[in-house]
Amino acid sequence: MKALAKLERGPGLTLTRVKRPEVGHNDVLIKIHRTAICGTDIHIWKWDDWAQKTIPVPMHVGHEYVGEIVEMGQEVRGFAIGDRVSGEGHITCGFCRNCRAGRRHLCRNTVGVGVNREGAFAEYLAIPAFNAFKIPPEISDDLASIFDPFGNATHTALSFNLVGEDVLITGAGPIGVMAAAIAKHVGARNVVITDINDYRLELARKMGATRAVNVSRESLRDVMADLHMTEGFDVGLEMSGVPSAFTSMLEAMNHGGKIALLGIPPAQTAIDWNQVIFKGLEIKGIYGREMFETWYKMVAMLQSGLDLSPIITHRFAADDYEKGFAAMLSGESGKVILDWTV
């Protein structure tokens, strides 16, 4: 089958032919319709330090996808040939304390599709049936293909009650922009998102952010004054991994505020712990999606009117993957979709 793989230890990916995956007794085989390019895939493309330490070579990658089930293992129940599915990209052990307690998103033995094992940038993908998630007919293939990052945004944004709250989001990448849309959808009062990328800040405006602030030109304090915010933000969603962004968030939080961290800052990043301790801030780290509560919430929000369509800005045939990665690398894109059916 056709697949997009890391064949050599260096930058780039190669469209190649690989063996169609075997289907275990508890697996489903998915014929891929669409995939989306993730920031993780950009790290793999660039072959940065993280990728060099993490990605097996050779291996085909990718973990954001939608497709249809074409084969099932003999032990699989609850699915049928032809079901349209996306899937949870974190494959968990099922036996550790967290898994057995129903906290699979905290499994210490997690294996990532397209990171630690063969991925979805291919014509077919085999995964455990447990990880497959049926997609309702009213949700398009394009939207279903971005359920993985949509899930990151959902898990982060819905970590705390947002109704009537003032929310600060630092980082207007696709996940941050989707988090802004989610926050407004569920009833936040003011949703302010910061970045230095005007293209993505404009996407955030289209998705419903109250204010999209280029912090290289505009003061967050001035924006807060314009919005008549006198006590600080109630909830912070840190999506950038940029130390200065986290510092500005800590300074802007109200006492008793709550922060969810999805962005990954450099190791040994220093912060002013006085801001955390004397403000009584609550800080929560976010990894992946809750299985499968996050997935049900994603579907419910789309069915109740959440519009994520503006975040999908580019579409290419899988054979034109280089154009897709160029769009992502340019910084002037939202989500980029690759079509494996043409």
Swiss-Prot record:
Catalytic activity field: L-threonine + NAD(+) = (2S)-2-amino-3-oxobutanoate + NADH + H(+)
Cofactor note: Binds 2 Zn(2+) ions per subunit.
Site features described as Important for catalytic activity for the proton relay mechanism but does not participate directly in the coordination of zinc atom, chain residue numbers: 148
Protein name: L-threonine 3-dehydrogenase
Pfam families named in the record: ADH_N, ADH_zinc_N
Active site: 40, 43
Cofactor section: Zn(2+)
Protein residues bound to Zn(2+) 2: 93, 96, 99, 107
Protein family: Belongs to the zinc-containing alcohol dehydrogenase family.
Pathway: Amino-acid degradation; L-threonine degradation via oxydo-reductase pathway; glycine from L-threonine: step 1/2
Cell location: Cytoplasm
GO cellular component, one term: cytoplasm
Gene Ontology process terms (BP): L-threonine catabolic process to glycine
Residues noted as binding Zn(2+) 1 in the record, renumbered to the chain: 38, 63-64
A GO molecular function held by the record: zinc ion binding
Origin: domain of life: Bacteria
Quaternary assembly: Homotetramer.
Binding site for NAD(+): 175, 195, 200, 262-264, 286-287
PANTHER family, per database record: L-THREONINE 3-DEHYDROGENASE
Main location: cytoplasm
InterPro entries named among the record's database cross-references: ADH-like_C, ADH-like_N, ADH_Zn_CS, GroES-like_sf, L-Threonine_3-DHase, NAD(P)-bd_dom_sf, PKS_ER, Zn_alcohol_dh
Entry keyword set: Cytoplasm, Metal-binding, NAD, Oxidoreductase, Zinc
E.C. number(s) listed in UniProt: 1.1.1.103
